A protein has these predicted regions:
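A structural boundary/capping signal
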Residues: 1-130
Length: 130
């Protein structure tokens, strides 16, 4: 099924939608524990001309995503799978190995060099405390 939503850009609204997608991805990953983690999936980065945000299943089928979809996927797997989603070299890996949290409170964040109230190029990242 395809659902298109057209919005006037607002940073807070974009973050709410991306974090909603991360939560949906977490639900999918909990319901289907055999799904591969993002770094094991073969999915790669590809810049999009039009923004299409896929859930985890559609991202796997498509085989690629840009930073927004990849960030929502990564946040979703940290939320769903906790410490087992971290790999050596990831921030907080050693601490997560010791604490073994079942869930990590991950969220999608936006970074930009644009001035306030002047949308420009944004990049999505994942932030998570341990």
């Amino acid at each position: 099924m395809r659902i298109a939503v057209k919005l006037a850009f607002h940073e807070d609204a974009a973050l709410r939608l991306l974090n909603w997608l991360a939560q949906e991805n977490a639900l999918l990953l909990r319901a289907q524990p055999d799904l591969p983690l993002l770094y094991d999936s073969g999915v790669f980065y590809r810049r999009e001309l039009d923004e299409t945000w896929c859930d985890y299943l559609n991202m796997l089928a498509q085989g690629h995503e840009d930073c927004d979809g990849l960030a929502a996927a990564r946040a979703g797997e940290l939320i769903a799978r906790g410490w087992t989603a971290l790999r050596p070299g990831d921030d907080g890996f050693a601490e997560a190995q010791r604490a073994r949290p079942a869930r990590i409170r991950a969220e999608v964040m936006l970074t930009t060099r644009s001035e306030p109230d002047n949308p420009g190029l944004y990049h999505c990242i994942v932030r998570y405390p341990l």
